[in-house]
UniProtKB/Swiss-Prot annotation:
Annotated protein name in UniProt: Mannuronan C5-epimerase AlgE4
Residue ranges of the TM segments: none
Name of the gene: algE4
One of the GO BP terms on file: alginic acid biosynthetic process
UniProt pH dependence: Optimum pH is 6.5-7.0.
């Protein structure tokens, strides 16, 4: 049965506060055992119902809101509202609500004319509780101009579907999936949100994302991550099709998660890596188009690295393991350092199969002793045999990747555009002819203490074509050697140049690398690759219901 809000006194004139009239129609539908509350075309202004967890409009079992179409029926927060509103439209906190939703309308948070954090759609039970909302359907809904989240279904929700909907110009994420089970996001678009386009968090599992698009967002296009609390990781998630492009950070970030498949997507033009796997296991990256990323920093198109949460809630070091990257077409921008790169942080068991990689400075760099490449001849890094301390490791006339061991190695790239990583120990590095990259994957690879020097020496750095890759170390740029910067200086004779930090780790080690000759006039961000600005993903606290303390990013 349909309940027309105008029969309950709603005007939809863009001026009057219609909250009470719309809620009366919802209550009538619920009292009758369920139904559809219909809002004809018009702008319906609403105010806060009371506490943040009361929202503006409270849906109940069996009740759906329906309008005349996105942009035709608009529910808009009144000017001057100064209250926190956890869901302009929402379900009740602490109650199990089922068989409800909304379709064919727009929610407008009016963020330019209000204050207080306002979310668009919110539903969920109680974090950590045994109950859940069930059977939720949202179709053809636009959520815009919220100061908080656009769509924010929360823990726990079972069998939720959001399809053919849009979230844009919101202050945080466009779409959140916070502890959803057996749920689907399909054919949705998130753009121009201040943070992520899509944020999948807090133990969400058995979840499918099909043909969604995220572009022009202030952080990542799509994030799948655990978050602040020590909970079960998001898992068994399929991301199929769609596009993630022109976002400020990663196109897709998979962090502290497991059993994820990303396939058939177009990922391009993002500020950082196209895909970043960060402390995740059993990830499959299949048949995607990944291209022209690294727009804001020198980073790989696809980056595999582990995540250190030992100081966090879990006390765990999340090693990235068992990543399968197959059948992708990967091409780089001018800043793309590698097509696919593993960090030297324990990441291992990566399988790279039949990927087409072009237009990057180097195609592949792997450190894991069990990681493999097939379909790309010559892409596997060359590594010295055990006990090669002091023995030379020499490349040939092609583009080589030379990896030192734990001793004082000597690496000579020979001809070609080579990658040299001396590893631990005091190494001597020579790129030879070609545009070479000298990689430092850990601060302890090249350092000094108050009593000893263990820095590597680069013998033939050519500033016009060679590069020093420090992106794994977290330094932000050149400076005075403090605050995450490196000081550039020469010795008294001007025969040796140093890049050095004055900030020691717990063992008293301060990063330092030496270059033969005076390079004070030619080392810059053009040939020294620092950590990408804003590419680390902190675990920020997110707002939940009016009684919850917080969630994750």
């Amino acid at each position: 049965m349909d309940y027309n809000v105008k029969d309950f006194g709603a005007l939809g004139d863009g001026v009057s506060d219609d909250r009470a009239s719309i809620q009366a129609a919802i209550d009538a539908a619920y009292a009758a055992g369920g139904g559809t509350v219909y809002l004809p075309a018009g702008e319906y202004r609403v105010s806060a119902a009371g506490e943040p967890g009361d929202g503006c409009l409270m849906l109940k079992d069996g009740v759906y809101l329906a309008g005349a179409g996105m942009g035709e029926t608009v529910i808009k927060l009144i000017d001057g509202s100064d209250q926190k509103i956890t869901g302009m439209v929402r379900s009740a906190y602490g109650e199990e609500t089922s068989n409800f939703g909304m379709r064919d309308l727009t929610l407008d948070g009016n963020r330019d004319n209000t204050s207080g954090k306002v979310d668009g759609w919110f539903n969920g039970y109680i974090p950590g509780g045994d109950g859940a909302d069930r059977d939720v359907t949202i179709e053809r809904v636009e959520v815009r101009e919220m100061s908080g989240y656009g769509f924010d279904p929360h823990e726990q929700t079972i069998n939720l579907t959001i399809r053919d909907s849009v979230a844009h110009d919101n202050g945080l994420d466009g779409f959140v999936a916070d502890y959803l089970v057996d749920s689907v996001f399909e054919n949705n678009v998130a753009y121009a949100n201040d943070r992520h386009g899509f944020n999948v968090v807090t133990s969400t599992h058995d979840f499918v994302m099909t043909n969604n698009v995220a572009y022009g967002n202030g952080s990542s296009g799509l994030v799948v991550q655990r978050g602040l609390e020590d909970l079960a990781l998001p898992s068994n998630i399929l991301i199929d099709g769609g596009a993630y492009y022109d976002n400020a950070r990663e196109g897709v970030l998979l962090k502290m998660t497991s059993d994820i498949t990303l396939q058939n997507a177009d990922i391009h033009g993002n500020g950082s890596s196209g895909v970043r796997v960060y402390g995740a296991q059993d990830v499959q990256i299949l048949d995607n188009q990944i291209h022209d990323n690294a727009q804001a920093a020198a980073v790989p198109e696809v980056l595999l690295q582990s995540f250190d949460d030992t100081a966090g809630a879990s006390g765990t070091y999340y090693t990235t393991l068992n990543t399968r990257i197959e059948g992708n077409t990967i091409s780089g921008s001018a800043n793309s350092t590698y097509g696919i790169q593993e960090r030297n942080d324990g990441t291992d068991y990566s399988s790279l199969i039949d990927n087409d990689i072009a237009g990057v400075q180097q195609p592949i760099q792997l450190y894991g002793p069990h990681s493999t490449v097939s379909g790309e001849p010559g892409a596997t890094p060359q590594q010295p045999s055990t006990g090669s301390d002091g023995e030379p490791l020499v490349g040939g006339d092609t583009d080589d990747q030379l990896q030192g061991g734990s001793g004082a190695d000597r690496l000579d790239g020979g001809a070609g555009d080579d990658i040299l990583d001396g590893g631990a120990g005091r190494d001597r590095l020579s790129g030879g002819a070609g545009a070479d990259t000298f990689v430092f994957s850990a601060r302890e690879d090249s350092y000094r203490t108050d009593t000893a020097v263990f820095n590597d020496l680069i013998l033939d750095f050519e500033a016009s074509e060679d590069r020093i890759d420090l992106s794994a170390l977290g330094f932000s740029g050149l400076g005075d050697g403090y605050g995450g910067t490196l000081l550039l200086k020469t010795n008294a004779e001007g025969t040796r140049t140093y890049l050095k930090s004055f900030e020691a780790d717990a063992e008293g080690r301060r990063f330092e690398v030496a270059l033969d000759g005076d390079h004070t006039g030619d080392l810059s961000a053009a040939n020294v690759v620092f950590a990408a600005t804003g590419t680390t993903t902190e675990l920020e606290v997110l707002g939940d219901s009016g009684t919850q303390a917080g969630a994750i990013v």
